[in-house]
């Protein structure tokens, strides 16, 4: 019974991640949650300039979350995971995009960070989502209004995000197969699989008739 419940929970989590990926690709804000709180995040790649002001905190700062590699390229201290840069609240979206995509540096952009530090785990998890969504791994983030999650935003947990790669690689559906003679062997078959969770496709090339009792060469 517990095993069936665990499987149900894992699938439900994978669906939440899938929906979060769609939201990010469409430029919508989401909530990333864990037992300690909520981070409201928006991918800068799809962010509307008018929405930037929604992420300016009460102290006038705008928090940008980047990968450690990008931070190092900007000349900042390398952190073990994501870093969070508090920028002046009037920083333009154009400047944010240039900082996040390697087209400039902190000095060249004439932006003086108010604070630089390691991002909290929720904001860091958003970068993992960006990789799954195949978008620029950079987000603006803020605390939720009134300290609680906005029920109008899609909510996904850190556990959902961490478990997603295990689930998406575990369930593959065969969608097509065809015989395709090759120069090395006329007895060859291409089999295409699609992930049940995720949008990646995998191709298996079967040459001749492998002995399933022996290790299959890859």
Where are these regions (language model features)?
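Catalytic domains of riboflavin
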Residues: 1-218
């Amino acid at each position: 019974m517990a095993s069936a419940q665990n499987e149900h929970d894992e699938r439900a989590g994978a669906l939440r991640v899938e929906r979060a990926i769609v939201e990010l690709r469409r430029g919508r804000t989401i909530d990333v949650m864990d037992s300690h709180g909520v981070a409201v995040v928006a991918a800068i790649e799809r962010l509307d300039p008018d929405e930037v002001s929604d992420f300016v905190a009460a102290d006038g700062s705008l928090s940008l979350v980047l990968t450690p590699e990008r931070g190092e390229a900007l000349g900042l201290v390398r952190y073990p995971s994501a870093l969070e840069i508090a920028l002046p609240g009037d920083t333009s979206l154009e400047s944010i995009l240039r900082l996040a995509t390697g087209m400039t540096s902190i000095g060249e952009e004439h932006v003086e960070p108010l604070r630089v530090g390691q991002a909290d785990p929720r904001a860091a998890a958003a970068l993992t989502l960006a990789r799954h969504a195949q978008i620029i791994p950079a987000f603006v983030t803020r605390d939720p209004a009134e300290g609680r999650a906005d029920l109008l935003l899609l909510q996904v947990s850190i556990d959902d995000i961490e478990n997603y790669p295990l689930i998406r690689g575990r369930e593959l559906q065969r969608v097509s197969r065809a015989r395709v003679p090759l120069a090395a062997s006329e007895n060859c078959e291409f089999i295409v699989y699609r992930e049940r969770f995720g949008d990646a496709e995998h191709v298996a090339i079967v040459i001749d008739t492998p002995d399933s009792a022996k290790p299959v060469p890859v």
